[in-house]
Amino acid sequence: MLREQNFDVIIVGGGHAGTEAALACSRMKKKTLLLTQNINTIGALSCNPAIGGIGKSHLVKEVDALGGIMAKAIDKSGIQFRILNSKKGFAVRSTRAQADRKLYSQTIKKTLLFQENLLVLQAEVDDVIVSNYKIMGVITQTKIKFFSKAVVLTTGTFLGGKIYIGSKCFLGGRINDYSSINLAQRLKDLPIKIGRLKTGTPPRINKHTINFSKLDVQYSDNPLPIFSFMGNQKEHPRQIPCYITATNEKTHEIVRKNLKKSPIYSGLITGIGPRYCPSIEDKIVRFSDRNAHQIFLEPEGLHDIEIYPNGISTSLPEDVQVEMIHSIKGLERAQITRPGYAVEYDYCDPRTLKLTLESKFIEGFFLAGQINGTTGYEEAAAQGLLAGLNASLYASNKCGWFPNRGQAYLGVLIDDLCTKGTKEPYRMFTARAEHRLILREDNADLRLTNIAKSMNLIDNSRWTRYVEKLSNIKNETTRLENLKIRSKLYSITELNNFFSIKINTESTAKDLLKRPEINYSTLMLFKKFSPGIKDKEAYEQIEIQEKYCGYIKRQIKAIKNQLNNDYIVLSKIKNYKVVKGLSNEVVSKLNFYKPYSLGQASRISGITPAAISILLIYLKKKLYST
């Protein structure tokens, strides 16, 4: 029986942000409550059945390094694994995996239900309890009150959600799931700026009605990639391929002819959709010079008959969707199992949040995921973990933590959101990170595991693996440095012939890794340099450090310069009118955004270098006068 109870932290929502937040809090030994509308949809992949991709996989690996569940779950449910940008540099290489929807959700759900310190309840939250601008708890639809020191709100697309299919409109945050109307109205009464965004999904297709013989096939990579730093290939289920087709002029003509029937173009939807995942209607209007748009036919699971046609998200009427699908090669007789639709929902301006994802105006109230204006499972999971760990720290009366832009893609994500805000669904890309050579997906554990350990976010097995990897890197680096290439020890002619290179001066085996044609594996083929280590993750780090040594040093220097301003805290300035010389516009923006540091202030639109100089002078005067 549900009754009033007290908790350290309450999580509202069981999506990717909510599950990571709940697990982070419970691992940090906090009495945690997760409230979700439907226990059966915990960890559901609401849109495409995939995890990772360009920039997104970096977030997944960082979540994993901080003890999160997403990478482990996809390793156990991924049915096609690939490395994107594999022919490019390590900084932009990204892992992506197709997921078996049911397996993925089951893995997440099982982890939560067996997690110590965590109670999962099925209940809809209608209200939050706020007293003197401090969060006190939540109230469910059935009027039960749950009290806590902190609340993490992760409502996804359910806050005031409306679903559109052609001219039809009905309430929902996902097809067949109710939207949160009362909670949406309650948030409008709080000091939170609310906006509207839109997302969408394509129709699903019965795989038995597709002519795959006409289509290109895309298989998993060999060897199979792994997401979690604690994972292995044996965890992967059976692998199956995806297929590729494309729209054509006939498809485009059908869409153009029916544009007025799309709620996006009829004026029914006012929310802005994702720029980097546009609907097929938007693609055909915005890219009118293109005569085809690629479509990836992605299986929804090993034993699922449904196919997800990635690339044709739409909210056109159902009859138009059928006509459109039948115009595409291989889908001439395809049967739609459920139509595509658009969802319009409320989001909160993330500029009203601290970098810890706590509200600047309501103490102990944290927001994470799509409610902050992002799109994507990975962005949500990363925010959820950060909000969860900070809610736990808050509940313990400890200072919050957040990574900087030179420390993690998560740092880039929250700095972009909380400093610049967003007017459209925000998606992570490697291009958003100015220090991406440092922030590779392969070294996320080296960047963040020790921090996770300090906050009790990880178990002993992960820490042991981390220490072992560091030791392997250090010892093997030292060994390669000590393998001197001198004429007395090695025949330089022998080396030159073996590697097809020209060495004229004395060097080391480690120096040879700087050459583009030599990697660690080929280096170990030279008997006098072998045997090497078997730890692939460790020797890849050695190789990367050598090949990009000069670039990495320059980026580290740039990060240090940037951090100089990020370490100058502004939180003691309550009203910027006291700083003489600032324009009214600058004062207004600084008072509204309340930047944490001088570095964050410098990244706010409209804050000039001159204003930053004035602030720096003011702070120095205050320092010397005390």
UniProtKB/Swiss-Prot annotation:
Subunit and interaction comment: Homodimer. Heterotetramer of two MnmE and two MnmG subunits.
Organism the protein comes from: Buchnera aphidicola subsp. Baizongia pistaciae (strain Bp)
MF (Gene Ontology): flavin adenine dinucleotide binding
Protein transport as UniProt keyword: no
Highest taxon listed in the record's lineage: Bacteria
GO biological process assignments: tRNA methylation; tRNA wobble uridine modification
Keywords noted in UniProt: Cytoplasm, FAD, Flavoprotein, NAD, tRNA processing
Signal peptide interval: none
Biological role stated in the UniProt entry: NAD-binding protein involved in the addition of a carboxymethylaminomethyl (cmnm) group at the wobble position (U34) of certain tRNAs, forming tRNA-cmnm(5)s(2)U34.
Flavoprotein is among the record's keywords: yes
Family according to the record: Belongs to the MnmG family.
Subcellular localization, as worded in the UniProt entry: Cytoplasm
Cofactor: FAD
UniProt lineage: Bacteria, Pseudomonadati, Pseudomonadota, Gammaproteobacteria, Enterobacterales
Protein name per Swiss-Prot or TrEMBL: tRNA uridine 5-carboxymethylaminomethyl modification enzyme MnmG
InterPro entries reported for this sequence: FAD/NAD-bd_sf, GIDA_C_N, MnmG, MnmG-rel, MnmG-rel_CS, MnmG_C, MnmG_C_subdom, MnmG_C_subdom_sf
Pfam (any one): SAM_GIDA_C
Binding site for FAD: G13, G14, G15, H16, A17, G18, V125, S180, Q370
Binding site for NAD(+): 273-287
GO cellular component terms listed in the entry, alphabetical order: cytosol
